């Protein structure tokens, strides 16, 4: 019984294992899903009234933690917790000056402040 030689090469295996290219509509749908996921994460960061107050306060200008504690009538650990969540979400950015941490809104934070102000009007 004669055997036929295998003509499979590494190139053929590599080509066969590549996933088929996605159609344009599927790529666009995937991009929209990723945008929705990013928006969902962002909205989770601002889903707390205290964090919204922090954003609105920082929309008026940079503040240090002590000023935010006084403005919010909350303890420093509580305010620091909210600031950490907002910082992690890319909504605020810190600046160290001596022993004080000053916080300000990022571009995303500024846009969120405008939206929140519009909703509260």
Cite the ranges covered by each PLM segment.
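C-terminal edge and immediately downstream basic/flexible tail or linker adjoining helix-turn-helix-like DNA-binding
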Residues: 104, 113-121
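Solvent-exposed, charged/polar functional surfaces in cytosolic regulatory/catalytic domains
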Residues: 49, 86, 115
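N-terminal helix-turn-helix DNA-binding core of bacterial DNA-binding proteins
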Residues: 33, 37-77, 97, 101-108
């Amino acid at each position: 019984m004669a055997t036929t030689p295998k003509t499979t090469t590494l190139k053929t295996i590599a080509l066969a294992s590549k996933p088929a290219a996605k159609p344009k509509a599927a790529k666009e749908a995937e991009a929209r899903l990723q945008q929705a996921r990013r928006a969902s994460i962002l909205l989770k960061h601002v889903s707390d009234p205290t964090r919204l107050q922090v954003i609105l306060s920082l929309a008026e200008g940079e503040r240090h933690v002590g000023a935010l504690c006084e403005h919010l009538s909350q303890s420093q650990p509580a305010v620091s917790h909210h600031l950490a969540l907002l910082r992690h979400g890319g909504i605020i950015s810190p600046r160290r000056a001596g022993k004080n941490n000053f916080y300000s809104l990022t571009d995303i934070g500024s846009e969120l402040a405008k939206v929140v102000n519009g909703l509260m009007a």
